[in-house]
From Swiss-Prot:
Gene3D superfamilies cross-referenced by the UniProt entry: P-loop containing nucleotide triphosphate hydrolases
Effect caused by changing residue 645 to N: Abolishes 5' to 3' directional unwinding activity
Quaternary structure note: Interacts with DICER1, AGO2, TARBP2, EIF6 and RPL7A (60S ribosome subunit); they form a large RNA-induced silencing complex (RISC). Interacts with APOBEC3G in an RNA-dependent manner. Interacts with TRIM71 (via NHL repeats) in an RNA-dependent manner. Interacts with both protein products of LIRE1, ORF1p and ORF2p. Interacts with TUT4 and, to a lesser extent, TUT7; the interactions are RNA-dependent. Interacts with AGO2, TNRC6B and UPF1; the interactions are direct and RNA-dependent.
Keywords: Acetylation, ATP-binding, Cytoplasm, Helicase, Host-virus interaction, Hydrolase, Nucleotide-binding, Nucleus, Phosphoprotein, RNA-binding, RNA-mediated gene silencing, Transcription, Transcription regulation, Ubl conjugation
Main subcellular location: cytoplasm
Post-translation changes: Ubiquitinated by the DCX(DCAF12) complex that specifically recognizes the glutamate-leucine (Glu-Leu) degron at the C-terminus, leading to its degradation.
Name of encoding gene: MOV10
GO cellular component: cytoplasmic ribonucleoprotein granule; cytoplasmic stress granule; cytosol; extracellular space; nucleus; P granule; P-body
Effect the entry attributes to changing residue 530 to A: Abolishes 5' to 3' directional unwinding activity. Abolishes inhibition of RNA chaperonne activity of LIRE1. No effect on interaction with UPF1
Pfam families named among the record's database cross-references: AAA_11 (PF13086), AAA_12 (PF13087), MOV-10_beta-barrel (PF21634), Mov-10_helical (PF21635), MOV-10_Ig-like (PF21633), MOV-10_N (PF21632)
Protein name per Swiss-Prot or TrEMBL: Helicase MOV-10
Length: 1003
């Protein structure tokens, strides 16, 4: 069958492969079968366009006399090795020559006025000759793979007086550029009409975006010291771009335009309310304790802009200084309620601001088309299925008729949510609006968020003081009054735990209760079975302490559901899962419906009376729903044990909701007063929006605060004190190689790889591995950060295309029936940026024909690091996104993406069981210490592929230069993007801008 590739295409593919071997250090390899393996498993992914078969490529090289080929050996004739675009050293300029001596003062001079350096001075300017596009002050050079392009930058003196070129700085950290200057020495006088030429050669074997900057330093006309003399600079910003076909389809749809939020929603003096949803008829749970509103003080709202300015406590006005003093004082019992309440108020003010991102202008509503309810209107809300924004039954929003928004005092219509179906929300409005409504009438819509979680946290802070819980929150010593003998024999329900000494130790201390009133902590690193340990401990308490009653909680519905699923196996009649009425019953796992408060016959939630709920040995709720038990005023001594799973993932006031008012400190040997926290302080904590609350401690969970600051939980010479804390050490998830770096960085090398050998080594012989037996791939991509429309979140087309290529290899059908070799359910894709998540989903479900044709492709989860916490997959792919250097400092300031956020890095890389693939820019990531260790680990063990690995460079000097160059390079925002940082900081946290976290709906 004739090849579909021409001889020229076969030859070019072979030359590109030969260059690829040079970059990888494999140019001496001659074994034909080994070369075939490298070509098929590794080279084709980074080729960017469809590549010919290995044998066809060899044929093309052979007939072109570029290779010697036998049945067992292949020898490529020596070529001009373009992987590094090499030139004769006598002509080639050193990149950034003399920059180490001058770069600090040089970069400082042009920090604020980059645009000025694009224009000629004293008649001197730069002429460009060669293929390029000029865009926003940047010279864009489009490359075909393995094909050289040459650009000549001609510095011409078009003035009437002589000038002197004193220095020339080609600033570039990538080998795709080479600069040479025809042996013209510097300094070089340039008389009127004279030129100085710099030749720029560009070539790449890899798709990507490769930036460079050229800076000319000149001495102006006139004698030194005379009028007109002086140093001036001219700059040109270059970018070589080689796109894969898929990446070309992912370019920004519309230019990025930053939106401004105009303030609070328009709520006028005239408000008309719709009808609230009917309360469940089976709501028998008492409401004995009132719940306050706890609105932020108006004065705090007024002072917030000044607080965000970061004024020193010593120079700030008195009110600001007092608030800052409260924020900067360490958390103690004496300031516990005051400081945490202030932080909650600040977080709420940020939420009020962030929710405005979702407001809609001139959107139509229609009559409810499905239920034929004449009193409900339907509104399309993009993103509501992903809780962006969160809209639940019982919530409300405000709507103004578009035609009335400019009136002096229009009517604001308050609509209550009755039903949510995919991206459609069904709302009840007042009869006066319904009487004049016609399909297609347009509105301005302002969203709100549910304040219930904040209100119950404020109440919990009040109750903490009322019930004097300081011995539990700031423990100093145990009462040492055991409930059972320390040698009590535990017959485990899960017999597999008997071989794990750490899990046995934790369960024994929890059951005997020797730690009270101090909480007992199960420190569970990734994959060590903390939830399994906690569940078995609950079962043992039920078994050995007949009078015990347990409240088991988690911050999320999924976490609470998991507790219920595992407890019901052995305690089916003793447990009850209490769900919030806003929970979509379709999202509730089928196996827990028999033991939860859903009445299938009535088709609604029920809430049994307090007396009925007290009959169950174990109640399971989210932390926020536990507030309903406080409102019902359960007896303070009813719950003897409170277990909180995922305790490191919630704010401290959120943990208090399940404690304050439901548990008291026990002074005697009576059962009770035992709090158990399970989590990992090295993984992600609570998701916060306000930069102030992040800075001043609201991001600390109760678990992390105790581990960090309380002496009872400190690690001593002999390890942790098992009376208070157990660190689980056996990892049952990951291949030892995947576990290696996070184990060394975050867990003192103590974790032991105990995963099933067959499961963890499933991909050790996968053809796509750069090195067999090493199931980690770091695929280097020099991509480009992009943004589009009014979304501030970043995406990287080249990385998205590379991830898609790997998915095609992993999910390729293994038979003609179309059955995937690997189930999409076993694969997860992680990216820290919301827009990149959207682009990768678009590739999978729309652009790529092979992937979108898989029946179960919808089961492949693509999400943020936060969305994957607590989960695992056989294969994890990570797209780090950040590549253009112009936004590095934004990441450093706000802990965005992976840079400078060890917890996010730790969670991302520890989700994988058998194969971890990371796609990112090694040059950028190498400036973070943790990523640098990981990159070198991959390189040393043969797991690195993609663009050439950067040479080792001094970390601090490299970072200084990188950040300095970021101020020179044009960004996607245009030539004045250095103005972007202070503007975008104003009033909002970087996390909510870039990552766009889900709005909490765990009620």
């Amino acid at each position: 069958m004739p090849s579909k590739f021409s001889c020229r295409q076969l030859r070019e593919a072979g030359q590109c492969f030969e260059s690829f071997l040079v970059v990888r250090g494999l140019d001496m390899e001659t074994d034909r079968e080994r070369l075939r393996t490298i070509y098929n498993r590794d080279f084709k992914i980074s080729f960017g366009t469809p590549a010919p078969g290995f044998s066809s490529m060899l044929y093309g090289m052979k007939i072109a006399n570029l290779a010697y080929v036998t049945k067992t050996r292949v020898r490529f004739f020596r070529l001009d090795r373009w992987a590094d675009v090499r030139f004769p050293e006598k002509r080639r300029m050193k990149l950034g020559s003399d920059i180490s001596k001058h770069h600090k003062s040089l970069l400082a001079k042009i920090f604020y006025d980059r645009a000025e350096y694009l224009h000629g001075k004293h008649g001197v300017d730069v002429e460009v000759q060669g293929p390029h596009e000029a865009r926003d002050g940047q010279l864009l050079i489009r490359l075909d793979l393995n094909r050289k392009e040459v650009l000549t930058l001609r510095l011409r003196n078009g003035g009437t007086q002589s000038v002197t070129l004193t220095h020339l700085f080609p600033l570039c950290r990538t080998p795709q550029f080479a600069f040479y200057n025809e042996d013209q020495e510097l300094p070089c006088p340039l008389g009127p009409g004279e030129c100085y030429e710099l030749h720029v050669h560009c070539k790449t074997s890899f798709v990507g975006y490769f930036p460079a900057t050229v800076l000319w330093e000149l001495l102006g006309p006139g004698e030194s010291g005379s009028e007109g003399a002086g140093t001036f600079y001219i700059a040109r910003f270059l970018a070589a771009v080689a796109h894969s076909p898929l990446a070309a389809q992912l370019k920004p749809m519309t230019p990025f335009k930053r939106t401004r939020i105009t303030g609070n929603p328009v709520v006028t003096n005239r408000i008309e309310e719709g009808e609230r949803p009917d309360r469940a008829k089976g709501y028998d749970l008492e409401l004995s304790m009132a719940l306050g509103t706890y609105y932020p003080p108006p004065r705090l709202r007024q002072l917030l802009p000044m607080l965000l300015q970061g004024t020193s406590i010593f120079t700030a006005p008195k009110e600001i200084a007092e608030i800052k003093a409260q924020l900067e004082t360490a958390l103690k019992w004496r300031n516990y309620e005051v400081k945490l309440r202030l932080l909650l108020h600040l977080e709420e003010l940020q939420m009020e601001h962030d929710i405005r991102h979702y407001d809609l202008e001139s959107v139509p509503m229609t009559w409810d088309p499905v239920d034929q309810n004449p009193r409900l209107l339907t509104l399309e809300v993009p993103g509501v299925t992903e809780s962006r924004p969160s809209v639940l039954r019982g919530d409300h929003l405000f709507a103004l008729l578009s035609s009335e928004t400019h009136q002096e005092d229009p009517i604001t219509y308050k609509g209550f949510v009755h039903k949510v179906e995919l991206d459609r929300v069904k709302l009840s409005f007042s009869m006066s609006l319904l009487s004049r409504f016609v399909d297609g009438l347009t509105f301005k819509v302002n969203f709100t968020f549910n304040r219930q979680p904040l209100r119950v946290q404020h109440r919990a802070l009040e109750l903490t003081g009322r019930w004097l819980l300081w011995p539990m929150l700031f423990p100093v010593a145990p009462r040492d009054v055991p409930l059972l003998p320390s040698d009590v024999k535990l017959k485990l329900y899960d017999r597999s735990l008997e071989s794990n000494p750490e899990q046995l130790q934790a369960m024994r201390h929890i059951v005997t209760g020797t730690t009270r009133p101090a909480p007992y902590i199960i420190f569970g690193p990734p994959g060590t079975g903390k939830t399994v340990t906690l569940v078995e401990a609950i079962k043992q308490v039920v078994k050995h302490l007949p009078k015990a009653h347990i409240l088991a909680c988690a911050p999320s519905n999924s976490g609470a559901d998991l507790l219920c699923q595992r407890l019901r196996v052995h305690l089916p009649s003793s447990i009850y899962r209490l769900l919030a009425p806003s929970r979509d019953i379709r999202m509730v796992p089928e196996d827990i419906k028999p033991c939860c408060n859903w009445d299938a016959k009535k088709g609604e939630y029920v809430f049994p009376a307090k007396k009925k709920l007290q009959e169950y040995r174990v109640l399971i709720t989210t932390l926020i729903t536990a507030g309903r038990l406080v409102s019902a005023q359960f007896p303070i001594d009813h719950f003897t044990h409170i277990f909180i799973d995922e305790a490191g993932h919630c704010m401290e006031p959120e943990s208090l909701v399940a404690i304050a008012g439901l548990m008291e400190v026990k002074e005697t040997g009576d059962p009770g007063g035992q709090l158990v926290l399970a989590g990992d302080p090295r993984q992600l904590g609570p998701v916060l929006r306000s930069p102030l609350t992040q800075k001043h401690g609201l991001g600390y969970s109760l678990l992390e605060r105790l581990l960090t600051y309380n002496s009872l939980y400190k690690k001593g010479p002999d390890g942790y004190d098992p009376q208070f804390i157990t660190k689980l050490l056996r990892n049952y998830r990951s291949h030892p190689t995947i576990l290696d770096i996070p184990n060394q960085l975050y867990y003192e090398g103590e974790l032991q790889a105990c995963a099933d050998v067959v499961d963890r080594e499933r991909f050790c012989r996968w053809a796509g591995l750069p090195r067999q037996g090493f199931p980690i791939i770091f695929h280097g991509v020099m991509g480009k950060d992009e943004r589009e429309g009014n979304s501030p979140s970043f995406f990287n087309p080249e990385e998205a295309a590379t991830v898609t290529s790997y998915l095609k290899l992993l999910l390729a059908p293994s038979s003609k029936k179309g059955k995937a070799r690997l189930s999409p359910r076993s694969v997860g894709v992680i990216s820290p940026y919301r827009k990149q998540v959207e682009k990768i989903r678009y590739c999978i479900t729309k652009l790529d024909r092979e992937l979108r044709g898989l029946d179960d492709i919808k089961d492949l989860k693509v999400g943020s690091v936060e969305e994957f916490q607590g989960q695992e997959r056989s294969v994890i792919l990570i797209s780090t996104v950040r590549s253009s250097q112009s936004f590095v400092q934004l990441d450093l300031d706000f802990n965005l993406g992976f840079l400078k956020n060890p917890k996010r890095f730790n969670v991302a890389v520890t989700r994988a069981k058998a194969l971890l693939i990371i796609v990112g820019n090694p040059l950028l990531l190498g400036h973070d210490p943790d990523w640098k260790v990981f990159l070198e680990f991959c390189k040393e063990n043969g797991g690195y592929t993609g663009c050439p690995f950067p040479a080792k460079l001094d970390l601090q000097q490299g970072q200084n230069l990188l950040q300095g160059l970021s101020k020179l390079s044009p960004s996607t925002s245009g030539p004045h993007s250095h103005d972007y940082l202070p503007q975008e900081r104003e009033g909002e946290g970087g996390l909510s801008l870039q990552v766009e976290p889900e709005w909490r709906n765990e009620l």
